[in-house]
């Protein structure tokens, strides 16, 4: 299943993405982020991380450098202490 999603993202990057001007506000791009997240964390967790990243990619977000966290690194943005 993981390879299917990786193949779909690579297909998007190769055939669909070049048809539109670059608009991603982040580095790495959202599709590259999703690809790396799925490779590193698997389809469910990595896919969820990719979806959250795409939802943050809009004109009202400043964007910038936002790499995929390493395995074991805290990657969720919730407040666990309060």
UniProtKB/Swiss-Prot annotation:
The keyword Secreted does not apply. Pfam families: YidD. Belongs to the UPF0161 family. Could be involved in insertion of integral membrane proteins into the membrane. It is found in: Cell inner membrane. PANTHER family: MEMBRANE PROTEIN INSERTION EFFICIENCY FACTOR-RELATED. NCBIfam families: membrane protein insertion efficiency factor YidD. This is Putative membrane protein insertion efficiency factor. InterPro entries: Membr_insert_effic_factor_YidD (IPR002696). It is a peripheral membrane protein. Keywords: Cell inner membrane, Cell membrane, Membrane. Disulfide bonds: none annotated. GO terms for cellular component: plasma membrane.
